[in-house]
């Protein structure tokens, strides 16, 4: 019994050992297979990473090559541009050099011609001097013979006869002297006239400028006809707000493709034009938005005036100049006289005056400075309403400008005599610039003066802040200060302005006077959570 149990136990033990061996073998196979699989997976991942790295490197190489090609192309383009620019500069410099050489040759020929003429005149004078000496000897001989004859036949003493002959000779010599003086004066005037014509002709031939006249309207294209409704606004609130803040008339074309801004004041029209362009581009057109954009554009334009003046000073090579004068030069861009832009006219005068002064032996730089500043007072006439000559003299004296500049401001309107070559050059250049065909339009200037006169009448009254002449002078819109004028005073001011216009105006028609008084209160609400 016990031996049988032992046998069974041995069998069980052997079976367990065999099972354990089998399990060990199977597990070993499984772990080996898993290891192989993991190894293959790691190898595949390594190959994938290697492939990705290689692809990335190749892509980077392609990108770098593309970038290199692009940079190379940019370098070549820039090099080509610089080369073209320098070639143009070189051609321009050669052209200037050729012009200078031609000018020097012309001057040399002119001087040689003058020298020959002077030598010829000197020889003539020498010949006349010799002839005069010979005639004097002949006269003395004739005088002696006549004296002897008269002493023989007349009852005069020798001294009396001598005095008679001397008086007669003196009268004859005085007559000859007067004739010679008149002849030389005539020749000098003719020669001076020819030379002045030659100088003016050469100055105008060497000057090349842009000739442009100012219109009284500005046209702005509309993206589509729907914008007409946006600009007008509900019940016309937008267009009324725009007219009120800008003082500019606005009209629409028949085909609704554009609108037209009309004002004699170039600066006011420029601000209004830029404001309307921004509003149309943005699409948000509301009364508050209109006022906000208008004031922002006005501030930006004021800042640009100094930059504009500095550009003109650099262009004309005038050297140092006070900032106030530069700002006033920039402001002249928005002023006109008889339809001619004031800044363009002043630049023309400066360039022409420099050329003329150079020909006459004057200071070219000083003549240019006097030319650009001769109408500087026009930048202040719309604000101060006084004569531009006196305004220009005041501002130039305040900044201690050269007396030649002051003399040019006075002399170009005949308030003073011309005291220098530079001043004469400015006066001649001013006449050339203003007198050329098509430079000025008298009708436009008369219209602008009529509009400005209406605004000046309104601004004379106490409490008036702004005044805008609109609708071609048929309407005068006046804005009064709410802290100085009460509501019951508004009709009285309107009637007074209308009466003053009736007394002052010299043209037929009606002018509607609209006086506006407005109070605004602004506060800020703070929101708390």
UniProtKB/Swiss-Prot annotation:
Transmembrane segments: 4-24
UniProt-listed GO biological process terms: mRNA catabolic process
Membrane topology value: Single-pass membrane protein
E.C. no: 3.1.-.-
One Pfam short name: RNase_Y_N
Primary location group: membrane
Domain of life: Bacteria
Enzyme class: hydrolase
Keyword Membrane: yes
A GO CC annotation given for this chain: plasma membrane
Domain KH intervals: 216-297
Localization of this protein: Cell membrane
Keywords in alphabetical order: Cell membrane, Endonuclease, Hydrolase, Membrane, Nuclease, RNA-binding, Transmembrane, Transmembrane helix
InterPro entries: HD/PDEase_dom, HD_domain, HDIG_dom, KH_dom, KH_dom_type_1, KH_dom_type_1_sf, Ribonuclease_Y, RNase_Y_N
Keyword Cell membrane set for record: yes
Domain called HD: residue spans: 342-435
GO molecular function terms noted in the UniProt entry: RNA binding; RNA endonuclease activity
Family according to the record: Belongs to the RNase Y family.
Physiological role: Endoribonuclease that initiates mRNA decay.
HAMAP family: RNase_Y
Protein name: Ribonuclease Y
Classification lineage: Bacteria, Pseudomonadati, Campylobacterota, Epsilonproteobacteria, Campylobacterales
